[in-house]
From Swiss-Prot:
Pathway annotation: Porphyrin-containing compound metabolism; protoporphyrin-IX biosynthesis; 5-aminolevulinate from L-glutamyl-tRNA(Glu): step 1/2
Positions of substrate binding: 58-61, 116, 121-123, 127
Top-level taxon: Archaea
Oligomer status and interactors: Homodimer.
GO molecular function, one term: glutamyl-tRNA reductase activity
Swiss-Prot/TrEMBL site (Important for activity) positions: 106
InterPro entries: 4pyrrol_synth_GluRdtase, 4pyrrol_synth_GluRdtase_dimer, 4pyrrol_synth_GluRdtase_N, GluRdtase_CS, GluRdtase_dimer_dom_sf, GluRdtase_N_sf, NAD(P)-bd_dom_sf, Shikm_DH/Glu-tRNA_Rdtase
Protein name: Glutamyl-tRNA reductase
Residues the record marks as active site: 59
Length: 441
């Protein structure tokens, strides 16, 4: 079937391309991050086939969700953009790529916390919501992805409400703050946050809420200042770190790149208690810092222990969470199919009604005026009876997910809007009521 004759159903036109900690490792995820989301949106939206886009970036993933008229070309273009950001070729097996219903399922799983490094962690739900809100504010999201992300957030909330998957769960950055709270208490303490990326922001925000005096240290001073302003803290370049270490009570290091930002020599002059927590991957703190008796060093494993408290209980909830997701996925896809059916029927009825009115006008010019009401009722009744089986077949096809039948109906009746318009009207309650009124069904 020619591309122009296709009846688009937005789920079919959805792709997701990305990298995450499972397939690529956190170091590659860090490299692939887009420091300027607006520049990323601009680049992705220039891909000719892309109609809508949402960029979901967290500490553990960079994922691009797009509605497109050419899935293959769009996937290849997004892969190229991610490779350009990473500064290196990315092997095929390190990409995560989903199409259509599988892409929706993946997003629902992400929002529910099933794909998180810490099972059920709560931060991801907020991040999914904020990603869609940012795309909407900047004009890159349309009706399809708006509906998809709204449902993902709703499903994520339902999973957390109806299961214990997220009970007691926190992400790694939040867990590092909890660990410090348990070790030294954060109220009034001077905390250095090394790194102003996603993880650093979570640490800084949570620590500030607990009363810590937050100092952001980053290679790029402008980014440090931006985050410091958000949390009411101070900002310094990385070169100031050795001096700051002597004054701090605690440090959380959340950087990428693989180099050591805190070495044994860097803490040689520390002469009061200092807790250093490294949540970088790969590690960015030399374990030898613990040779200084004043330094308490905690690595990712120590933080993971805090994050994974109650993990076995949460694991037992995975099946229930997955059942909820599959049920919601079926409802979501069927909803989209029903919307398409309503769109076809509305366009069909409008077209047939216009033909009826035109032909009725011609007939009325040749018969006495007193027959007008009779002819109007007769032709209206005739149209309803002729189209009744078509309407039932369209409804039945939508219920079965039979897009072939829906396409055939749209082609036979030359329904141009249904054939060529990529967007679908999602709020169809008014359409349904109008159809019921017209057809008396």
């Amino acid at each position: 079937m020619p591309a122009a004759a296709r009846v688009p159903l937005f789920v079919d036109d959805l792709v997701m391309v990305g990298v995450n900690y499972k397939t690529s490792g956190k170091e590659l995820v860090e490299k692939a991050q887009f420091p300027d989301p607006l520049a990323a949106y601009s680049a992705i939206s220039r891909i000719p086939a892309v109609r809508e886009v949402v960029l979901l970036q967290t500490c553990n993933r960079v994922e691009v969700y797009a509605i497109t008229t050419n899935k293959k070309a769009t996937v290849e273009s997004i892969k190229s953009l991610l490779e350009a950001r990473a500064g290196e070729p990315i092997p095929e097996e390190k990409f995560v790529i989903y199409y259509g219903t599988d892409a929706v399922r993946h997003l629902f799983r992400v929002a529910a916390g099933l794909e998180s490094m810490v099972l059920g962690e709560p931060d991801i739900l907020r991040q999914v919501r904020e990603a869609a809100e940012f795309a909407a504010k900047e004009g890159y999201i349309g009706k399809a992805l708006k509906l998809t992300f709204e449902n993902a957030v709703r499903v994520g909330k339902r999973v957390r409400t109806e299961t214990a998957l997220g009970k007691g769960s926190i992400g790694i950055p939040s867990a590092s703050v909890k660990l410090l709270e348990e070790l030294i208490g954060l109220e009034g303490k001077k905390l250095l946050v090394v790194g102003a990326g996603m993880a650093g922001r979570v640490v800084a925000v949570n620590a500030a809420k607990r009363g810590a005096k937050v100092i952001i240290v980053n290679r790029t001073l402008s980014k440090a200042k931006e985050l410091a302003e958000e949390v009411g803290g101070e900002a310094y370049p990385l070169e100031e770190l050795p001096r700051l270490l002597r004054e701090a009570d605690a440090v959380v290091v959340a950087v990428g790149g693989g180099s050591k930002v805190i070495t044994r020599d860097a803490v040689a002059e520390v002469n009061k208690k200092l807790v250093i927590v490294d949540i970088s991957e790969p590690p960015a703190v030399d374990p030898g810092v613990s040779l200084n008796p004043y330094v308490i060093y905690k690595d990712m494993l120590a933080v993971a222990e805090v994050a994974n408290r109650g993990l076995e209980k949460r694991k037992s909830e995975i099946k229930r969470a997955e059942d909820i997701i599959e049920a919601e996925l079926n409802k979501f896809v069927n909803f989209a199919q029903r919307v398409l059916a309503d769109k076809i029927l509305r366009e069909l009825m409008e077209k047939v009604e216009q033909i009826r009115i035109n032909e009725l006008s011609k007939a009325m010019a040749k018969v006495p005026q007193e027959y007008a009401e009779v002819l109007d009722k007769m032709t209206s009744s005739l149209v309803k009876k002729v189209l009744k089986d078509v309407i039932l077949k369209v409804r039945e096809a939508a219920g079965k997910g039979d897009l072939t039948t829906l396409r055939i109906v749209a082609e036979v009746f030359d329904l141009k809007e249904s054939l060529n318009n990529i967007e679908i009207i999602y709020d169809y309650n008014g359409v349904e009521q109008e159809l019921k009124r017209k057809l008396e069904l």
